[in-house]
Regions:
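Conserved alpha-helix/loop element of class I SAM-dependent methyltransferases that forms part
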Residues: 1-2
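A short glycine-rich, Lys/Arg-flanked "PGG" loop and its adjoining helix->strand segment in the class I
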Residues: 81-92
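Conserved beta-strand signature within the Rossmann-like core of class I S-adenosyl-L-methionine
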Residues: 93-101
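Residues lining the SAM
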Residues: 69-73, 99
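Core SAM-dependent methyltransferase catalytic element
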Residues: 133-150
Length: 150
């Protein structure tokens, strides 16, 4: 539980609230929307930053033990090249966990990007499956958990 976690596309902090429930405390949030960042509970994250995840992330290489990206890979938001940045800022053997709206998985090229990163041994697949994401709206998402290899 003593690991440094980057919450990419943290929104209002829902992932941070869940992490806190499980005893994690060293996590950092980034989102493009200042309006959403303003709704994050005070002192939940060690640091909150307004960040465009479609551009290089202003973080050092190998800075984080894990990275979460939930609800951000969806229509009109963050594109597949962000996975390279996520991998760059995550340590060797660190974990990257994400969801991808099924409607953009192939259309935006996530399928090819994930396959390429796996084939190039840039990461190792631990879990990857489709699940109900917003069941009430019949929205499904792919859930991925990968271990970074460097």
């Amino acid at each position: 539980k003593n690991i440094k976690i980057y919450d990419a596309g943290c929104g209002t902090g829902l992932v941070g609230l869940e992490l806190k429930k499980y005893g994690f405390s060293d996590f950092y949030g980034a989102d493009l929307s200042q309006k959403l960042l303003d709704l994050v509970p005070n002192n939940l994250y060690k640091k909150l930053e307004k960040v465009d995840l479609n551009k290089p992330i202003n973080e050092k290489d190998n800075e984080y033990d894990a990275l979460m990206c939930v609800g951000t890979f969806t229509f009109g938001h963050v594109k597949p090249p962000a996975l390279h940045e996520f991998r760059r800022i995550t340590k060797n053997k660190g974990l990257i966990c994400f969801t991808i709206n099924e409607g953009i998985y192939e259309e935006y090229g996530f399928d090819k990007k994930i396959q390429k990163l796996t084939e190039e041994k840039k990461w190792k697949e631990l879990e990857f499956f489709k699940s109900d994401y917003i069941a009430s709206k019949d929205v499904n998402a792919w859930l991925g958990l990968y271990e970074v290899t460097k």
